[in-house]
Amino acid sequence: MPATPSQFIWYGLCSSNPAKAAEFYGAVLGWTVQGSGPTEMNYKAWLAGGEGIGGLLEITPDMALGGMEDGWLGYVDVEDVDASVATIVAKGGHSHMAQTVPGVGRMAMVSDPQGAAFYVMKPEPTDAGPSPAFAPRVLGHGGWNELHTKDSNAASVFYRELLGWTSDASYGMSAMGAYLTFNVGGDAISAIFNSPGFPKPRWLYYFNVDDIDAAKARVEAAGGTINAGPMPVPTGQWMLNATDPQGAMFGLLGDKA
């Protein structure tokens, strides 16, 4: 998997019904799924325009008993997974599991001090070039990464210190406070803000579409639910967030026709 330091390099969906998930995201985003991964788990890759941008993992009964729910998890490229995990734990976060997959890389599922889960990963090979997973305005790829949390100031400090993200801009959001955006290497990649309407802190990942209204209609026709939007954003685009038929939240980002 190609590397892009401190960037989101993969988007993984844990699903209680992978076949239904593949059908839904295929209808909404045009994705296809490919094969099974290098492990014994039922794992497939999401392809957008023929490029791998994420994975689809089946939630087994044992995983469900352990508390795993349908949802998306982003993978962030780090130089040293174990050192990053130690830093996360020292700062009040948690480590849930770590593994090394030959030919893919070392990774660990973690959560920040407020409970938002994500992965840190050191991909292999290390000279494969930039990951295509996050590619603003490229259809079907990740277009934005948004942390809904309870203390945006504390979360901002945590991610800046862990990943070296730098502040990009701040937008007022009335009662929710500031919408803080961050960049890596000069490229805007994420935002952090207080979101009291969410049941618990989580990352929400937005994928690019050509027409936000047409995409909204596809979500609804395929059995998904629109939670908010479409709403305009400073880039001139529009975004919405939604829930797939199995309960996983995601976002879409695009223009209006």
State where each predicted segment sits.
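DNA polymerase sliding clamps and clamp-related checkpoint/processivity subunits
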Residues: G55-P61, L65, G74, V78, ...
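Vicinal oxygen chelate
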Residues: M1-T4, Q7-S16, K44-W46, D62-T87, V89-G143, L147, ...
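Conserved donor-binding loop and adjoining core beta-sheet/short helix segment
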Residues: P38, A48-G50, L56-M68
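Glycine-rich acetyl-CoA-binding "A-motif" of GNAT/NAT acetyltransferases
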Residues: G52, D70, A117, A188, ...
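Short amphipathic beta-strand/extended segments with alternating polar/hydrophobic composition
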Residues: G54-L57, S190-N194
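Core segments of cupin and vicinal oxygen chelate
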Residues: P2-G52, A90, A98-G105, M109, ...
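Short beta-strand micro-motifs enriched in acidic
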Residues: Q34-S36, I59, S195
